[in-house]
C-alpha cells in the first residue's frame, strides 16, 4: 500500500468553498478503477493550509467513508508546532487510515536536531505508521539524509516522501536505512528515475488526472521494465511540469474540472483561479498526454 502511484488528491469544493462530497466520491471511484495504490488526503495538494483542523479531520474521515475499504487512505497530519502535529495525528488513531504523511515544520525552520525530536515525538504518541515529508522549496528547511537515518530507527517511522527532486538523495538515504524503509518520490518529473535508483513509488500530483497512466508506469518500473515505463513518462512529462505553471493545486484542480472529475475548480484564498495563459498551458499538456 506504500508503493506504486499514490495520489496526493485534491479536495473538491463547491462554488462557496465547501467540500463537495459528490465530487470527492467521483474522484475516489476514479482512482479505485484506475489502479491507484493509495490516497493521501489533505496534503499540500489537498489544500491543508486553508482548512481548519476540524475541516481537515472531516475531509479525511469523509475520504475513508467513501473509499469504503476499496483503497488505502493516508492522512496528511503535519504542522509547524510539534504539539499541534501530535494532536492532529491522534485524531486518526483507530480511524482506519493506514498511515500519516507528516511534513517538516514550515516557516520556523528548526535545526536537524529539532527535526529529529519533532518527528520522534509524533511517532511516540501514536501507533500509526509515519511517512516523513521533505519539501524544502515550500517549508524552508531540509530534512537531511543523516537525520532520516536516525529517524528510520524509530519503530513506526516507515518511510519518506522525498520532494527535493535531488536524485542523489535516493542512494544517500538508502545507505542509512533498512531495506524495508519506504522511499517515495514527491516530484512527478523525476519519479521514474527515482524508482530506477531504488525508490518504491511516488506521491503524485499528476495522478489526479492521469491515474491509470501513473499506476501503469509505476507497475512497469517496479517490475524492472524501465524502457516501457519511460514511454509513458515521456508522454506525461509536459503534464508533470505544467501542473506547476502556477502554484499547486491551482492547475491540477482546474485540470480535474476540465476532465469532468470535479464539478468546480474552486479554491480558497490566498489561492486564486487559474489565469487564461495557465489554462491554455495546462490544456496543451493534457492533450499531449492523450487525456483530451
From Swiss-Prot:
Pathway: Amino-acid biosynthesis; L-lysine biosynthesis via DAP pathway; (S)-tetrahydrodipicolinate from L-aspartate: step 3/4
This protein's UniProt keywords: Amino-acid biosynthesis, Cytoplasm, Diaminopimelate biosynthesis, Lyase, Lysine biosynthesis, Schiff base
Record family assignment: Belongs to the DapA family.
Subunit structure: Homotetramer; dimer of dimers.
Enzyme class: lyase
Protein name, UniProt field: 4-hydroxy-tetrahydrodipicolinate synthase
Pfam families, A to Z: DHDPS
InterPro entries: Aldolase_TIM, DapA, DapA-like, Schiff_base-form_aldolases_AS, Schiff_base-form_aldolases_CS
CDD domains found in the cross-reference section: DHDPS
Gene Ontology MF: a single term: 4-hydroxy-tetrahydrodipicolinate synthase activity
Organism: Escherichia coli O139:H28 (strain E24377A / ETEC)
Binding site for pyruvate: 45, 203
